[in-house]
């Protein structure tokens, strides 16, 4: 199965930490947040992972490489452009990262999962997929309620 990890953001809410490392690389109990995600994806049968990167991209790509260490294949989609031989990061936001999926049409030819690279998820991904398939829906989204006063600290889903 296939998954996409959104890991291109600048992590402005946790500066100054993210001036030196991208948010998915912030260590929790000795390893980067995103490593927990890669392990969880592998445990649930996701063996091909596309990661969109931008801010300090080389840190993520250098650490995770081709994914072999976790028994998965990892590919990268860089958000930015080349200027005189240098790569210039230019993140386009979560929606932009997901929109770029079109650039990898052959990669995303079946059911796939999109997760944020800076979030620890306590969720049975196999059960989520099973429920999605049973529903017959084109797309499913897993979200949680957040108290109104905490909304500014989280992403917002308008339904």
Which residues does each PLM region occupy?
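Unchanged
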Residues: 1-159
